[in-house]
Swiss-Prot record:
Function in brief: Binds to the 23S rRNA.
Entry's Gene Ontology BP terms: translation
GO molecular function: rRNA binding; structural constituent of ribosome
InterPro entries attached to this UniProt entry: Ribosomal_bL9, Ribosomal_bL9/RNase_H1_N, Ribosomal_bL9_bac/chp, Ribosomal_bL9_C, Ribosomal_bL9_C_sf, Ribosomal_bL9_N, Ribosomal_bL9_N_sf
Gene: rplI
Protein name as annotated: Large ribosomal subunit protein bL9
GO CC, alphabetical: ribonucleoprotein complex; ribosome
Highest taxon, organism lineage: Bacteria
Keyword terms of this UniProt record: Ribonucleoprotein, Ribosomal protein, RNA-binding, rRNA-binding
Family as reported in the entry's similarity comment: Belongs to the bacterial ribosomal protein bL9 family.
Keyword Transferase: no
NCBIfam families tied to this protein: L9
Amino acid sequence: MKVILQQDVKNLGKKGDIVDIAEGYGRNYVLPRGLAIEATPANLKNLERLKANEAKKKEQELMDAKELGAKLSGITVKVRSKAGEGGRLFGAVTNKEIAETVEKQFGLKVDKRKYELKQPIKTLGHYPITVKIHPAVSAELKVEVVSE
């Protein structure tokens, strides 16, 4: 019996795979639990359509990420913070502050978790920061921390 898996099944396959299983296993376990559907011509056609839509969606996400990466690359973000003697900040500049400043200054909304900041910035100066927008796309921007 050929079935199309609706979700990942251990020792059988991943979602969307077409697998050949025993009649009893399919009728008594896999189909009643909703783990798979029968591989009829209509269901196979539907599966192909879903895979094509998913591929288009992933391609669009990649294009959007590349576009955002191009906009972010090379920009300099000015973050104002209170500083004491020797250029040490009262507090620190974090991913959240950088994300808010980029959105305010340039209108580009990027999740704060995408900014790769090894540790918070605690002194005045220029800092290069990598933004991991998509697994395949990253951009480098500069953060300039200035005193208020």
